[in-house]
From Swiss-Prot:
GO terms, molecular function: NAD+ binding; prephenate dehydrogenase (NAD+) activity; prephenate dehydrogenase (NADP+) activity
Keyword Protease among record annotations: no
Name of the protein described by the UniProt record: Prephenate dehydrogenase
Catalysed transformations (reactions): prephenate + NAD(+) = 3-(4-hydroxyphenyl)pyruvate + CO2 + NADH
PROSITE patterns, sorted: PDH_ADH
Entry keyword set: Amino-acid biosynthesis, Aromatic amino acid biosynthesis, NAD, Oxidoreductase, Tyrosine biosynthesis
Domain Prephenate/arogenate dehydrogenase: 8-291
Organism: Mycobacterium tuberculosis (strain ATCC 25618 / H37Rv)
Family (UniProt): Belongs to the prephenate/arogenate dehydrogenase family.
Keyword Amino-acid biosynthesis: yes
Activity regulation text: Is inhibited by NaCl; more than half of the enzyme activity is abolished in the presence of 10 uM of NaCl.
Biological process according to GO: tyrosine biosynthetic process
Length: 323
């Protein structure tokens, strides 16, 4: 027999671009939402816009524990250990998720804090080059992929809660193992930051380049406008996957350079790149509808469906007696 998991209050820790957008989107969906922000400016901005936000972390976590809220960690990676220590002390029984762009490193920190049993990793694959409360908006996640981890430890009830939050925010849920997420994020999220930085630096060294720069340069360097400390936090936390991805790019560029110098041609790279982009444009996305959360091998089924392009756009049912 299946059931629908109740949607608990949402406690957002960190009200920047992503956390602030979650607060807005979840509230718009009718969820009870409250949050914490370290800076007075961010918390005041949220309150001025009609949201429930304070700068007292202990008070926020006490409320989360009392209401059994789903805690959303929306702070930079370097701040995680300290934040997890506070959660372990004040709200250890609360379900827990995050929005960090790496998953294995976060899982390691959560495990070290003794909070693994109630944790399900998350990563909304969206954003802008801006940060802070004022950068967020309630529509940020509309039709965006939102990874929800299906690692072996995840509790089905907590997983359902995180899935429901993502859906309430307007996202499409992509189930994935943490290590597979990190490999993919290195290629499609973190490596583009390195390339954008390198391209911006290269152009800055060429006289007249900025005067001639137009759409292709603007699009290719958009994420270079991101605050350097945020870029470092996401990229350096995924070193194990980003370094080999960078090696692959360097190899491709080196081969193209050698071919250009020797034969006056970049045909191999241009053809391969065009073919890969065409595959991306036609990549199939199908709705995942047959998996029951908590049923036998449900995690493996969701991971396989995610690899194949499957997404969840409507809440999946859960067993009465999760496994």
């Amino acid at each position: 027999m299946t059931r629908t998991v109740a949607a608990p209050p949402v406690c957002v820790l960190g009200l920047g671009l992503i956390g602030g957008s979650i607060m807005r989107a979840a509230a718009a969906a009718g969820r009870e939402v409250f949050g914490y922000n370290r800076s007075v400016e961010g918390a005041h901005g949220a309150r001025s816009d009609g949201f429930d936000a304070i700068t007292d972390l202990n008070q926020t976590l006490t409320r989360a524990a009392a209401t059994e809220a789903l805690i959303v960690l929306a702070v930079p990676m370097p701040a995680l250990p300290g934040m997890l220590a506070h959660i372990r002390k004040s709200a250890p029984g609360c379900p827990l998720t995050d929005v960090t762009s790496v998953k294995c490193a976060v899982l390691d920190e959560v495990t070290a804090a003794g909070l693994q049993a109630r944790y399900v990793g998350g990563h909304p694959m969206t954003g802008t080059a801006h940060s802070g409360w004022t950068a967020g908006h309630g529509g940020l996640f509309n039709r965006a992929p939102w990874v929800v981890s299906v690692d072996d430890h995840v509790d089905p009830t907590v997983w359902s809660m995180v899935m429901t939050l993502a859906l309430d925010c307007g996202a499409m849920v992509v189930p994935a193992k943490s290590d597979e997420h990190d490999a993919a994020a290195a290629a499609v999220s973190h490596l583009p930051h390195l390339l954008a930085e390198a391209l911006a630096v290269t152009a800055a060294e060429v006289p007249l380049a900025f005067a001639l720069a137009a759409g292709s340069f603007r699009d290719a360097t958009r994420v270079a406008a991101t605050a350097p400390d945020l870029v470092r936090a996401m990229c350096e936390a995924n070193t194990g996957q980003l370094a080999p991805a960078a090696d692959r790019i360097i190899d491709l560029l080196s081969r193209a350079r050698d071919s250009l110098q020797s034969h006056g041609s970049i045909a191999d790279l241009a053809d391969a790149g065009h073919a890969a982009r065409t595959r991306y444009d036609s990549f199939p996305r199908s709705d995942i509808v047959t998996v029951v959360i908590g049923a036998d091998k449900w995690r493996e089924q969701l991971a396989a469906a995610g690899r194949a392009g499957g997404v969840i756009t409507s809440a999946l049912p859960s067993l009465d007696s999760p496994q």
